[in-house]
Amino acid sequence: MSHNAFITEETIEPTDDGPLDGVTVAVKDNISTDGVRTTCGSEMLADYVPPYDATVVERLRDAGATIVGKTNMDEFGMGTTTETSAFGPTENPAAEGRVPGGSSGGSAAAVAAGDADLALGSDTGGSVRCPAAFCGVVGIKPTYGLVSRYGLVAYANSLEQIGPLAPTVEEAAELLDVIAGVDERDGTTREPPAGQPTYADAADGDVDGLTVGIPTELVDGADEGVRETFDDAVETLESAGATTQEVSLPSVETAVQAYYVIAMSEASSNLARFDGVRYGASGDEDGNWNESFAAAREAGFGEEVKRRILLGTYALSAGYHDKYYKQAQDARAWVKQDFDEAFESVDVLASPTMPVPPFERGESLEDPLKMYLADANTVPVNLANLPAISVPAGETADGPVGLQLVGPAFGEATLIRAGSALN
């Protein structure tokens, strides 16, 4: 194992034979594994050992997969670089000296380095797609409700989904086939429309007649090298039979602001349970609960997590709820409306996954706003609860570039078909 991709290296054997016999899978360390610690990349949960498997872990093991460890991540999923982990930063196997993306950077690095055949990550605002792009692998963010979140340690419930990372589109699709489906323990899961092929069967590269929309707002601000690589990939789709047309999504100009208000607000609520009593390391302040809670959270949380909790609490506080949180939800509805209107004239939307190549290590920690703004192309998808895939599009001098394809709800098969034309 290499690149500090893993927090815990431990073999979890399969419980049955199935389509993933002999396949090794790395699991992000915010997904519960029975008897194996699940830290969320945080000192707060450094010794937490779940007494149960997440639904996706059960399905992996039932399908014959061997889990090889729990992967490094930005603390509680809050980051774009996998540098906020309490267990040290992960290195990018595909771009020396640069970050692997986040927050599922350990999962992407494990696949890129060959430490695991496949991996699971979670995507709240791009946390599967960003590291997939930066590490030159494939990552899928499923439609909200396609994959069970039971056993996922919550950051922002209304936004996040568990998704696969793999070297190829077909392998990512095979993993999605295993983990997708209704779960009675997660009331948000839904059945996709009947009559669809398996996701693996959809990876046939047939894009003849497919209409691809290019949102100008998600392309115009991209780094020059990223834009050139993206344009070349679009030409590949066109040569395979797809047609392209420009579309406009004016609402995405507000998406980053809306996303961070909503995500931080949900985080401030979800992370309230980590107080050293119910969950997390004790504050050891005898006789004074307030001081004990404060000491536990001061010692247990890193700076980025504290920042987001404070901002989220502020956005929900009396007198500011309507000014921030309600306006963010209104912006979210506008984003969804724009996507719905776009899909009336195109089958999928294409953009660079990330508008920039991989950051140099340490670069974004000095400027958190820069890290937030880098999510501009990915967060609108989570706000609209839509599926997306990041596929390697090529490389610049600074590292890999991903192409993101977005589809209507439960349109994963179409995304996989289009993505496989590039992969």
From Swiss-Prot:
The keyword Cytoplasm does not apply. This is Glutamyl-tRNA(Gln) amidotransferase subunit A. It catalyses: L-glutamyl-tRNA(Gln) + L-glutamine + ATP + H2O = L-glutaminyl-tRNA(Gln) + L-glutamate + ADP + phosphate + H(+). It comes from the Archaea. One of its GO terms (biological process) is translation. It holds the Pfam family Amidase. Belongs to the amidase family. GatA subfamily. It comes from Natronomonas pharaonis (strain ATCC 35678 / DSM 2160 / CIP 103997 / JCM 8858 / NBRC 14720 / NCIMB 2260 / Gabara).
